[in-house]
């Protein structure tokens, strides 16, 4: 009996793996639109999919980012300047894409643009500190999706939303984690709404990667700037040594980040080209072995493990 059970499990695993390897045909006539292509995941994705033969439309925030990308890619690739937080810019870009792709529609929309914003204890922050990551990571993503969706429906294509392990587990104060939690919710509702139209919607949850988003120098500068303007009461509660110790912890954590950005692009590739794309992808050793498993554990255990890494406050009773 045990042998039959093992054989059945092996067969299921084999069929699941085989199904995941089945690919679409004729990618040469398929258009894909990628946001956040100045650097990081988006830049590598644009170059990778251009080499594979897709007709890539890469959205960059800056002229310099656009020119640098064009210098490394073929004439098939087109760049557009796009600020995802600017509704008129998004609308105009969608109109240009519509005229460019014609009746073929848009096979792939990869929502990759994102910012980290301020990462600091919640009681250090104002509501304005939350705005930028929520405007870019959430409202920008939603607005781009809504404007491009008719083109994706026409092609019965794919929508790929780049979230984060920060959308599964909160690891710091600021707008980044709330924005990514909301992206996960938007992704799930969009996936169910689009199923009847033959549109596949996938979510990618990278761990910590070495990109401009997680630049320890910029993160440190933002944290120091906030510390300097905190009230004496807050500084007394946290202690003068807190900021130095927390910055040391930050540098230690960023020294062990994933270096291979292609792990995320491979997830994008599977979501774009597989006949049976996954609903969720996890990228990075830390995400697979620590963050995602931890997200399924009881909240008390999550708190215990994460608070072990927190810097102790000097005088929390001084309230």
UniProtKB/Swiss-Prot annotation:
SUPFAM superfamilies: NAD(P)-binding Rossmann-fold domains. One of its GO terms (molecular function) is testosterone dehydrogenase (NAD+) activity. The active site is at residue 176. It catalyses: 3beta-hydroxy-5alpha-pregnane-20-one + NAD(+) = 5alpha-pregnane-3,20-dione + NADH + H(+); 17beta-hydroxy-5alpha-androstan-3-one + NAD(+) = 5alpha-androstan-3,17-dione + NADH + H(+); androsterone + NAD(+) = 5alpha-androstan-3,17-dione + NADH + H(+); 5alpha-androstane-3alpha,17beta-diol + NAD(+) = 17beta-hydroxy-5alpha-androstan-3-one + NADH + H(+). NAD(+) binds at residues 34-58, 83, 180. Highly expressed in epithelium of estrus uterus. Transmembrane segments: none annotated. Substrate binds at residue 164. Its main location: membrane. 3-alpha-hydroxysteroid dehydrogenase that converts 3-alpha-tetrahydroprogesterone (allopregnanolone) to dihydroxyprogesterone and 3-alpha-androstanediol to dihydroxyprogesterone. Plays also role in the biosynthesis of retinoic acid from retinaldehyde. Can utilize both NADH and NADPH. Homotetramer. This is Dehydrogenase/reductase SDR family member 9. The lineage of its organism: Eukaryota, Metazoa, Chordata, Craniata, Vertebrata. The gene is Dhrs9.
């Amino acid at each position: 009996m045990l042998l039959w059970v093992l054989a059945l499990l092996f067969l299921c695993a084999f069929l699941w793996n085989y199904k995941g390897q089945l690919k679409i045909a004729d990618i040469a006539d398929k258009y894909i639109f990628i946001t956040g292509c100045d650097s990081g995941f988006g830049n590598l994705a644009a170059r990778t999919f251009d080499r594979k033969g897709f007709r890539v439309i890469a959205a960059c925030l800056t002229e310099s980012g656009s020119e640098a990308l064009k210098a490394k890619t073929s004439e098939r690739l087109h760049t557009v300047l796009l600020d995802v937080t600017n509704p008129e810019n998004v609308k105009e870009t969608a109109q240009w894409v519509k005229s460019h792709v014609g009746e073929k529609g848009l096979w792939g929309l990869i929502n990759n643009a994102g910012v980290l914003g301020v990462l600091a204890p919640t009681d250090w922050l104002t509501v304005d500190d939350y705005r930028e990551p929520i405007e870019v990571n959430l409202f920008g993503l939603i607005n781009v999706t809504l404007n491009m969706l008719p083109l994706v429906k026409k092609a019965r294509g794919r929508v790929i939303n780049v979230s984060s392990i920060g959308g599964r587990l909160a690891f710091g104060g600021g707008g980044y984690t709330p924005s990514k939690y909301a992206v996960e919710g938007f992704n799930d509702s969009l996936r169910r709404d689009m199923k009847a139209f033959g549109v596949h919607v996938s979510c990618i949850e990278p761990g910590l990667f070495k990109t401009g988003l997680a630049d320890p120098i910029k993160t440190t500068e933002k944290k120091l700037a906030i510390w300097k303007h905190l009230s004496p009461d807050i500084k007394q509660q946290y202690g003068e040594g807190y900021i130095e110790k927390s910055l040391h912890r930050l540098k230690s954590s960023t020294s062990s980040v994933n270096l291979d950005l292609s792990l995320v692009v491979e997830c994008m590739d599977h979501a774009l080209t597989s006949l049976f794309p996954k609903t969720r992808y996890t990228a990075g050793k830390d995400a697979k072995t620590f963050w995602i498993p931890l997200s399924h554990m009881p909240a008390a255990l999550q708190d215990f493990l994460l608070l072990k890494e927190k810097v102790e406050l000097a005088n929390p009773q001084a309230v």
